[in-house]
């Protein structure tokens, strides 16, 4: 799916996702420009090239697909706002812009959020409810993205979801850190009344996740269903540690 929009046809990818009932897709074609300048600037040619996949989706499927813009926290505020302004000028209507600047710089994130009409999402990279509280108090995000593998686990994630709800904001649990984290995130999504969307990386869900575990939540017609079993429902495949390509790390308390 990454290659489909990076070097192929993002419109065809959007059509493929829609056949599964998936109505939102995230793309990050701006990263190369950020690496070139350390996020300080983006040239007109780079900006135009990065906008093309988004234009293509709108051309092929219209408004049937929500478009999320991922910036991976790579930009300084002026360049991030330049990107946002490009979307504001065109009839693309992104659902959100995610992590436009470093998420640990709440002041910079707030300057961005207050400088654009587009919704801002942040951030799976924050490590506990304290960071999210600062984010929310600064009014620096419209949507709250969290990753249970990075924010402190299920208990901390639930506290963050409740905190976001108290500010009137929805959450969107992140997927990219493995099948167990994703399954736990699905359970949080079902539990939290302010869940907007549960992210899933289709290539992972249909690929290497299935090589590691059983009991993954089911994705059907754009919705997630978890198994009616105790816990998160995921179990490692038998013999996984014995695979020739497996790397086993053991930790313990002496």
Residue ranges and their predicted role:
Residues 1-110, 115:
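Metal-dependent enolase-superfamily TIM-barrel catalytic cores that perform enediolate-based chemistry
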Residues 5, 45-49, 152, 177, ...:
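Catalytic cores of large soluble enzymes that bind and process phosphate-bearing ligands
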Residues 85, 92, 96, 102-227:
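Shared catalytic-loop signature of beta/alpha-barrel
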Residues 213-254:
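C-terminal extensions of enzymes
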């Amino acid at each position: 799916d990454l290659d489909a929009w990076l070097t192929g046809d993002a419109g065809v990818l959007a059509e493929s996702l829609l056949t599964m009932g998936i109505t939102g897709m995230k793309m990050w074609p701006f990263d190369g420009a950020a690496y070139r300048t350390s996020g300080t600037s983006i040239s007109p040619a780079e900006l135009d090239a990065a906008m093309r996949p988004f234009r293509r989706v709108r051309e092929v499927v219209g408004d049937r697909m929500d478009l999320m813009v991922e910036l991976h926290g790579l930009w300084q505020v002026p360049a991030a706002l330049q990107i946002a302004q490009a979307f504001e000028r065109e009839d693309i209507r992104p659902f959100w812009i995610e992590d436009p600047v470093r998420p640990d710089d709440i002041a910079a994130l707030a300057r961005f959020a207050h400088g654009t009409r587009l919704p801002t999402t942040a951030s799976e990279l924050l490590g506990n409810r304290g960071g999210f509280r600062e984010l929310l108090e600064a009014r620096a995000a419209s949507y709250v993205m969290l990753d249970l593998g990075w924010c402190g686990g299920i208990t901390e994630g639930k506290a963050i979801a409740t905190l976001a709800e108290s500010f009137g904001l929805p959450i969107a649990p992140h997927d990219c850190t493995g099948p167990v984290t994703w399954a736990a995130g699905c359970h949080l999504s079902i539990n939290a009344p302010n869940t907007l969307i549960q992210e899933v990386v289709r290539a992972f869900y249909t690929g290497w996740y299935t090589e590691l575990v059983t009991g993954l939540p089911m994705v059907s017609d754009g919705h997630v269903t978890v198994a009616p079993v105790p816990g998160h429902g995921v179990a490692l495949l038998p013999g996984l540690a014995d695979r020739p390509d497996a790397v086993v790390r053991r930790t313990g308390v002496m």
